Amino acid sequence: KEELLMLKERQGSIILCRIKLAEAILLAANEAYHLGMTEEATKLFAGFRTGMGMGGTCGALSGAIGVLSSKYGTREDLKTICADFVAAFEQKLALGTTECRPLAAKYKQRQTLSDAVELTAEALEEFIDKLEGKAPAEGCTLRSEDIKRVKGMGF
């Protein structure tokens, strides 16, 4: 999907520039979903780096919650939306946790944390599509050629 690929591409360039996960998710989604946030506003998420500096809640998750808050902040069910996304995040990253330390331990064993960013981007895209009625009930999937294209970009 074009939005997901754009989200992943933007995150890749942000990660390469050494911006942390919370800001990477937020900046990429801001561009992909036209949220209208200034780069200055995204600095509000700098404190969510490395689990708020102590290995707590994953920065990528914090950034994704920021995206959901920006898109759906006026909805009465925002609390449920966020809780449902946290569950989707835990399932997608396959550790059943939102904590930075165990996630970093798993994903640092790979080349970089870009796998965690990619999985968070996928979870966010699938979640938003489902929430907006765009995805089938079982969730959306990437085509193999999309994955190959993104991996060819250094992910």
Please give the residue ranges for each predicted region.
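Buried hydrophobic packing segments
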Residues: 22-29, 63-71, 120, 124
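Short, hydrophobic/aliphatic alpha-helical segments
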Residues: 3-5, 35-51, 152-154
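C-terminal binding/interaction regions
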Residues: 83-155
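Glycine/serine-rich anion-binding loops at beta->alpha junctions
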Residues: 50-67
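Polybasic, low-complexity association/targeting segments
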Residues: 1-17
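Acidic-glycine-rich active-site phosphate/pyrophosphate-binding loop
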Residues: 25-45, 92-98
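Phosphate-handling active-site elements
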Residues: 32-43, 69-83
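An acidic intrinsically disordered interaction segment
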Residues: 16-35, 84-88
